Amino acid sequence: MQHLKNIRSGNPKTKEQYQLTKNFDVIWLWSEDGKNWYEEVKNFQPDTIKIVYDENNIIVAITKDASTLNPEGFSVVEVPDITANRRADDSGKWMFKDGAVVKRIYTADEQQQQAESQKAALLSEAESVIQPLERAVRLNMATDEERTRLEAWERYSVLVSRVDTANPEWPQKPE
């Protein structure tokens, strides 16, 4: 099975390659061990999955046809076409680590960033519920149920705004 690591663009190494670059602006891609991507792509097996992953081992592309890939700046590995490997996708939630396709392991910083995004989304949702209820109260058009809902959502909004995203504990959303 093929595994080409850290593929980068580089200079042509033969006269033929130089002529192709000169005549057609061909960009040559080389793995860290000096293998030519355009030659190696022919050696991938047709019945395997080809996975492209970044410097953090995060899967960024998956295909059965290696010739469709532009792996510049990435690594490409060939893995068996089995259920365990087919479950992966290029959503950023999967990794190629220690020779296997695994669910992504997030760093503490990434987890905090995800919590920040979730916090912003929850606050936005709360505001979208609160605004029309506030308007109904301000215009003396609110029912008792709307006043109760407004208070519940405002309390929820305050609790969400106080969540420590380094160690999030999310409050229960009002009904």
UniProtKB/Swiss-Prot annotation:
Gene name, Swiss-Prot/TrEMBL: U
Similarity comment text for this entry: Belongs to the tfa family.
Expression induction: Expressed alternatively with tail fiber assembly protein U'. The switch from S-U to S'-U' is performed through inversion of a DNA segment called C by the phage invertase protein Cin.
Pfam family for this entry, one: Caudo_TAP
Swiss-Prot/TrEMBL keywords: Chaperone, Host cytoplasm, Host-virus interaction, Late protein, Viral attachment to host cell, Viral receptor tropism switching, Viral release from host cell, Viral tail assembly, Viral tail fiber assembly, Virion, Virus entry into host cell
Entries under InterPro entries matching the protein: Phage_T4_Gp38_tail_assem, TFA_Chaperone
Function: Chaperone involved in tail fiber assembly. Expressed alternatively with tail fiber assembly protein U'. Remains associated to the tail fiber and participates in the host receptor binding. Two alternate tail fiber assembly proteins U and U' are encoded extending the host range of the virus.
Domain of life: Viruses
Name of this chain's protein: Tail fiber assembly protein U
Principal location class: virion
Protein location: Virion; Host cytoplasm
One GO CC term on file: virion component
GO terms (BP aspect): symbiont entry into host cell; viral tropism switching; virion attachment to host cell; virus tail fiber assembly
